[in-house]
């Protein structure tokens, strides 16, 4: 009866461990499979005319895809483009996944904003059409910016726009080391947007009273070590979020504080318009590149020591702990049963314990990641950025941990059950 009870206990432990490894929590404890697909609301997309003002949506009325497919013919007007939207805009709430293809970004506060980056490893210029949102919080159903990636951030509120600027090691979100980067914006070469269908919301527009506000004009420059994101509203939104200087980088387009090691929120004055100098307009590619405008002044600043969520590290730690606990329990039970059995059964138990240990170790390995980077993050013609360095984070390891753990737990449990059956 004792051995039968042991077998039943081992089966129960296996089932419980498997369920724990696969179950989507949706509470920030681990990557949630629900964040890897859109919500399938099947709400219609409004009409769209190229180079005309785009439709806006209340957040609750978003279509599955803002742009979808077949908006224009590929290569229309001699320009490349016309490809379908690769991600989705109706994203799961209050959860996250490093395989998410959510293309709805947010800029709400110093602790709650998103940046655009490649969905798969590649330069910003190569991957801007299919970029996805990476956020500092798990509220938006996106991928997470790993803790330690952002090494300085400066959030500024004005009456006409809100922006966040800073430095970091963005090899952790699949931007190659040394990539000077480029611009994400809602237009692109064919007005489908970079990324196609990418949209931005904010709760920081004073006129929206804290409700999500659809941002029609925004700009986000990204490189391997520098970022800037601005969301504009009002009559001068297009001019204050200009998108024609895509190789000029952050410091030329959005002069601001990029100091590393500082995380602050400030009120700010309105900056001068990009490319406008005493009534004349600079065009990218002109023989002489003018200097960047001075950074506007700011006031009423408050700071914190850093920003982070702890979710990727917590998820990895919890998953490893779960495997170690269930494996230890199975090995202990098998050893107890073995000591009361014959020498032959005892030998089998020792083999089983070894197999369990081996399988657990193989289920917790990490994937590949990019190296660290330092240097300027601006495009040609811009001033040199603050240097930054640091070990890159593996953005795919956390996303695949649940499936890896399920396999390793399953193998360990099967071996333990086999040993118990042999003893019977």
Swiss-Prot record:
Residues 37-54 have a biased composition (Polar residues). One of its GO terms (cellular component) is extracellular region. One of its GO terms (biological process) is appressorium formation. This is Appressorium protein ROW1. Residues 1-21 form the signal peptide. Induction: Induced during infection of maize. Keywords: Cell membrane, Membrane, Secreted, Signal, Transmembrane, Transmembrane helix, Virulence. The lineage of its organism: Eukaryota, Fungi, Dikarya, Basidiomycota, Ustilaginomycotina. Residues 295-304, 327-347, 383-398 have a biased composition (Low complexity). It is found in: Cell membrane; Secreted. Residues 362-382 have a biased composition (Gly residues). The chain crosses the membrane at residues 404-424. Plays a role in the formation of the appressorium, a specialized infection structure with the purpose of penetrating the host surface, and is required for proper remodeling of the appressorium wall and vesicle secretion. Disruption phenotype: Results in a thickened cell wall with altered glucan composition, and leads to secretory defects. During infection, decreases appressoria formation and plant penetration. Decreases virulence on maize; double knockout of ROW2 exacerbates the effect. Its main location: membrane. Residues 22-403 are extracellular. Residues 19-54, 69-90, 278-304, 327-398 are annotated as: Disordered. It comes from Mycosarcoma maydis. It is a single-pass membrane protein.
